[in-house]
Amino acid sequence: MADFTEQTLRQKLTNLSNHPSSIQTTSAWLLQNHSNRELIIRVWLKTVKKETHGSKIVNLLYVANDVSQNARKTCPQFKDEFFPAIESSFRHAIELKNAKEVEHAIGKLINVWKDRQIFTPSQCKRLHEVHQQVKLSGSFPTPAVANKEHGKVAQPSQFVVEEAKKNAQDVLLSLKRLQNPPSTEREIRTELSKYPDNISCPEKLQSVRSSQEAQSLLVQNEEALPMLEEYVKRLKNETNERETLESNLNMLIENVRMSIEHHEKLCREVKRREDRIKADLLEVEKTFESLPDLAAEMPNAPLPTLEALFEKRKK
């Protein structure tokens, strides 16, 4: 396979076709170079967002799907880090017109990921919510398209701005919920540590020699079980919350990066217009200075009277 460079990566993603061999070959190459996954994900997302053809976007989504499924064994973090970009690409589909092909592909992928447990239920739920927005988007023109139709510079869609605000709010809420997580609760761990090891280690049950010991152990087990199940449940919720926080942070970083790119572009455009205005002003000043001084050439010439002007007009 070809050596990894950013140029090679862009070329492979651009030349991607809907043939299964093209998808699989590209996916295998990306997995082989998983050490560059941060760059791969960033370039992949930019390629998706530059595309306006539904078929091209579908091909890119299928590559992401193949990478995510095959990365579970070779590089699980590749799949986890890919999710925010996949969600962002789904949101990009909302801005497309006549994106039935993309909408169908998104629905199909979500079902596959849910059935095969590629992504967590909460992640699949978020993708499903975006999918519903894609379904509804066909009836409403986007602000960016409307601006292009009127010959104006396209502004970033309001949806992206609202998405960034929502990401920030979600991050703050997650951080607030994780201020006192179950994993830091000393009391419950101290309480559980009071029980003998026999109730959590089956091998040590062999040391039980009498029915009285077995009965005592059973009572302790029944007493500890509800407490342990409740604690494990809260720990699981904490883990899910941390996964959600990680996804929201990655999405927030991507939105901030997009915002920076937009404002840098805006600054360059303002600077270009400022330079043009200064050049025009300088040209006007030069033209003004080159005009003859009528007062100096005819200092004593009287101005014509109003009657003389009317008489001249009648003639």
From Swiss-Prot:
It comes from the Eukaryota. SMART domains: RPR (SM00582). Residues 227-273 form a coiled coil. GO terms for molecular function: RNA polymerase II complex binding. GO terms for biological process: mRNA 3'-end processing. Keywords: Coiled coil. Residues 1-135 form the CID domain. The keyword DNA damage does not apply. The keyword Coiled coil applies. This is CID domain-containing protein 1.
